Amino acid sequence: SLVNGQMSYMTESFASMGTNQISVNVTNLSTRSVSVDEMYEFYEDNRDLFAQMTPNVTVSTTVKNGTESSTSTTVSGVSEEYLEMKDMELEAGRFIQYSDIVSRQKVCVVGYYVAWDLYGGVDKALDQTIKIGGNAFRIIGVVSRQDDDELESGGSDDFVWMPYSCAAKMTRNANISSYTFA
């Protein structure tokens, strides 16, 4: 079919560019929305094309530890597959699990900069509470340092990842519209 032919062409095109991820934004569907379950069904039906998928929910908010706060930190809701998709590793702790997503556990994984800037170190950040938009989350993991040059506000180590189910609730967004496939 035309769609399968186009998908094959696109897959070859992405492979030739060295790109192994594709972002999908579902917008302008005035009569209906596409649910997370429907996107997972699409993903499962196309496992020959995709190894992983994650919904992405961006949260614009402040993160705090006591009186220390950051407005430059990127806060995102992701799935349990995100760490592997980003080809990153944990410095300490564990990553978000499927059970965290289903039960909307208020847990998060932070970047190296956040651990040092707000807590003074990786070990000091682990199992501590971080306020995200006024909500208390427990830090369950710290991602290994990404930026070899310097740790800086707004840099590649300045992020917090939480279960996408929590992020969707925080943003009062019942319809997640951004997904990444790998």
Walk through the language-model features, giving the residues of each.
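Short aromatic/hydrophobic contact patches that present stacked aromatics
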Residues: 23, 178-180
